[in-house]
Amino acid sequence: MPIIYRRMTRDEALQSADIIVQAYAKPPWHEEWSIQNAISRIDELTTTPMCLAVAAFDAQRPVGFAFGLPHTSVMGRGIHVAEIAIRPQHQRSGIGSCLLKRLEEEARIMGYVHVWLVSRCTGGVADYYKSNDYQQSEKLCVYSKKLT
């Protein structure tokens, strides 16, 4: 069955939260997401004004998705790729690249002028983004702090 790429509704996204659980359990992430945390993450994304959600569907079932959130900066109206996840059995088949392209096309139509994301800076994930014409920032890095 062919993969269909289209916008995803909030309900479809919430019903597909298990994609996050499955995708992030595998290397290189090794993250143990609960389904409740995944649902909460999808809820956060889809209730953000101007959230752009695209998905890959195998028949009626989503096999992957990408979420973009608006982020205006000195460069102008941009979109932040907040999540992209593919079911493990569908990874490394071009679906992620197609989702990124679809998200970029939709963002361009909506008037966005740049796209950015945060991810690992080395390894297969970095190679994946570079193969999709993303470049690492020479100016920025990610800082975090645990709140206790």
What are these regions (language model features)?
Residues 71-81, 91, 137-139:
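A conserved beta-turn-beta hairpin within the catalytic core of GNAT-like acetyltransferases
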Residues 2-18:
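A short beta-loop-alpha structural element at the N-terminal edge
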Residues 86, 92-105, 131:
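Conserved acetyl-CoA-binding loop-helix of GNAT-fold acetyltransferases
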Residues 43-55:
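A short helix-loop-beta-strand connector motif used in the catalytic cores of GNAT acetyltransferases and
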Residues 55, 61-70, 80, 85:
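Conserved beta-strand in the GNAT
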Residues 10, 21-43:
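Conserved GNAT-fold acetyl-CoA-binding loop/helix
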Residues 100, 107-120:
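Conserved GNAT acetyl-CoA-binding A-motif
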Residues 97, 109, 121-139, 145:
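Conserved active-site alpha-helix within GNAT-family acetyltransferase domains
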